[in-house]
Amino acid sequence: MEMTNAQRLILSNQYKMMTMLDPANAERYRRLQTIIERGYGLQMRELDREFGELKEETCRTIIDIMDMYHALYVSWSNLQDQQSIDERRVTFLGFDAATEARYLGYVRFMVNVEGRYTHFDAGTHGFNAQTPMWEKYQRMLNVWHACPRQYHLSANEINQIINA
């Protein structure tokens, strides 16, 4: 992240104010303030992650993934023989915090800030699947989009989607 000295000064002052406004996170803000003031390039890359951008298309895909899991769970709930499919297979796991942090952040934003998909269980890891999921979800979406009744799935269709 390239910043002018003036931009660094402004951001440093913002972190100083945040230290006073949010004492619970004061250490974090002091650390970031030091990084900005001293211009530590390696650590400034952390700010790139914090201030990164998630394109509209990616956001829509993540919402589509969450819609798919909503449809999977509702369809599974309506099955007469639910035992043929493990409930965990139709429960949204989230994304990997190590490799898909931006996607994970968006999921948490949608649930915790926007109030959507509040029925999803964040589990003990807060939607951190702890394994990369993007490719798997893409395969699942392709199968789901091919289903004629996306919100009234049969057991066979559910199995095809979760096994994609």
Curated annotation (Swiss-Prot):
Gene3D superfamilies listed in its UniProt record: Helix hairpin bin, yfbu gene product, domain 2
UniProt xrefs under InterPro entries: UPF0304_YfbU, YfbU_alpha-helical_sf, YfbU_helix-hairpin_sf
Pfam families linked: YfbU
SUPFAM superfamilies: YfbU-like
Membrane-spanning segments: none
Family, as annotated: Belongs to the UPF0304 family.
Protein name stated in the entry: UPF0304 protein YfbU
Organism whose genome encodes this protein: Shigella flexneri
Originating gene: yfbU
